[in-house]
Design a protein with these regions (language model features):
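C-terminal ends and interior cores of transmembrane alpha-helices
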Residues: 93-106
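Helix-to-loop junctions at the C-terminal end of transmembrane segments
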Residues: 71-82, 170-171
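A membrane-interface helix-boundary motif in multi-pass transporters
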Residues: 168-185
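Extracytoplasmic gate region of multi-pass secondary transporters
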Residues: 15-74, 162
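A late C-terminal transmembrane helix in Major Facilitator Superfamily
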Residues: 138-173
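Hydrophobic core of transmembrane alpha-helices in multi-pass small-molecule transporters
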Residues: 28-29, 112-126
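Cytoplasmic membrane-interface "Motif A"-like loop-to-helix N-cap segments
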Residues: 80-92
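Intracellular juxtamembrane helix-capping segments at the cytosolic ends
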Residues: 126-139
Length: 208
């Protein structure tokens, strides 16, 4: 079977799974709240509050530094803790931090802003190891990489929605506050949604 046929056949099978759509939806929120919102709009949002663009860009660069640490540590945790619980905390804390963000942006680098940057860096790709683990355990090991590929589509769609949507809200409303609050709310919904993912491998889906 060709690679394209395997990908399409896997999509057909996992599309019947509620757990797949939960993973797809929560990864949509992941992309929305990272690359789409913070990655694209943090610098202009900080600039709206009077922060120099170079300072804002430096803070965003720190996200990348702490991202490496957070991802490695999350992989270690995923081998030891229920990945659903990890995702609950990752999305939940991300949502709470986004609710706070509009109130901690200042014209200079405030300590509270730096704390946000460090946390967001640690959390940025921390969702990936437990998501991959759930693709393996819930939907089967045989095509786990293909399943994750389809879940990653949700991530990229979410990123594009936030990149465009936050810009529209900024133009219409004059600031990014509502965009941050919407993203925060979606993160909290994602945190609750992952707890509904079943335990064990749903082998029947991959056979059907």
């Amino acid at each position: 079977m060709s690679a394209a046929r395997i990908a399409l056949d896997t999509a057909r099978k996992v599309s019947k799974s509620r757990d797949f759509w939960i993973l797809f939806g929560t990864f949509f929120v992941c992309g929305l709240s990272t690359n789409g919102l913070i990655g694209t709009h943090f610098i202009p949002a900080a600039h709206d509050h009077g922060m120099n663009e170079t300072v804002a860009a430096s803070l965003l660069a720190l996200v990348g530094v702490f991202d490496v640490i957070g991802t490695i540590f999350s992989g270690w945790l995923t081998d030891r803790i229920d990945p659903r619980k990890l995702l609950f905390f990752y999305y939940g804390l991300r949502g709470l931090s986004l609710f706070l963000l509009p109130s901690i942006l200042f014209s200079t680098m405030h300590p509270s802003t730096l704390v946000f940057i460090i946390f967001y860096g640690l959390d940025w790709v921390a969702t990936v190891p437990p998501t991959i683990m759930l693709c393996r355990h819930v939907l089967g090991v045989q095509r786990a990489t293909v399943v994750y590929g389809w879940v990653f589509v949700g991530h990229q769609v979410g990123a594009s929605v936030a990149a465009i949507g936050a810009a529209v809200l900024r133009v219409k409303l004059g600031d990014y506050a509502i965009a941050f609050y919407i993203s925060a709310t979606m993160c909290l919904v994602a945190a609750l949604a992952v707890l509904r993912i079943a335990k064990g491998v749903n082998a029947a889906i991959l056979r059907g």
